[in-house]
């Protein structure tokens, strides 16, 4: 297996330069995983009630969780159209599921991940028309021991808290098992389907 890690800033110019570099190297993308997300930031936390919604905070959450992944995928679209059997995954979250929302709250985070899922669905429809061997995955990594989950880990049982290496192995395992069927899969780290 050969892994090529690429980094870029999230500007359109930076992403375009990365895509051009990969295109000129005739890179065949087998897996493209967009791994970014934010739940809280400077001066804001996940909303527990409608009255806590702050437009600036919500815009930041949507920028990171929804718009940035799509900006990456938009820049990489030419590669995805020409690569043999590319698997495209973006980190979603179970809390972005309408069918699995039993608690409410976390308005910005939940809705940003639900919006990401819809955009990934649109991408799956677009890609299948030009590259039927492509697959798109909205991936819920579980609760991973990262700065994003730190403030909320007290509510997570120790056996349910994944370490980064476990999360990476689970992602690899799930992506190794997906089938290019022209649809978007919404799955968790165990490979189980999440309801929309």
Language-model segments: what does each one mean?
Residues 142:
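Active-site-adjacent helical/loop segments in soluble small-molecule enzymes
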Residues 19, 73, 120, 168-171:
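Short-chain dehydrogenase/reductase
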Residues 21-36, 41:
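A glycine-rich helix->loop->beta "capping" turn
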Residues 138, 146, 150, 154-196:
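C-terminal helical subdomain
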Residues 38-42, 46-70, 81-130:
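Catalytic loop of short-chain dehydrogenase/reductase
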Residues 12-19, 149:
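A conserved hydrophobic alpha-helix of the Rossmann-fold in NAD(P)-dependent oxidoreductases
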Residues 33, 89, 136-139, 149:
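Hydrophobic structural elements of the Rossmann-like NAD(P)H-binding subdomain
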Residues 2-15:
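Rossmann-fold cofactor-recognition segment
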């Amino acid at each position: 297996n050969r892994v090529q890690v690429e980094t870029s800033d999230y500007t359109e110019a930076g992403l375009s330069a990365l895509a051009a570099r990969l295109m000129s190297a005739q890179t065949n993308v087998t897996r493209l995983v967009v791994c970014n997300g934010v739940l809280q930031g400077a001066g804001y936390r996940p909303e527990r009630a409608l009255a806590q919604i702050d437009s600036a905070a919500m815009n930041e959450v949507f920028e990171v969780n929804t718009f940035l992944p799509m900006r990456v995928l938009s820049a990489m679209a030419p590669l995805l159209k020409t690569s043999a059997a590319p698997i495209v995954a973006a980190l979603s979250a179970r809390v972005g599921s309408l069918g699995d929302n039993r608690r409410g709250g976390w308005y910005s985070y939940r809705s940003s991940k639900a919006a990401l899922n819809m955009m990934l669905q649109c991408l799956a429809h677009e890609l299948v028309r030009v590259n039927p061997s492509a697959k798109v995955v909205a991936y819920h990594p579980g609760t991973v021991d990262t700065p994003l989950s730190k403030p909320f880990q007290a509510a997570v049982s120790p056996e349910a808290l994944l370490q980064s290496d476990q999360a990476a192995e689970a992602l690899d395992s799930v992506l190794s098992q997906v089938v290019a069927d022209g649809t978007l899969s919404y799955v968790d780290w165990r490979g189980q389907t999440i309801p929309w």
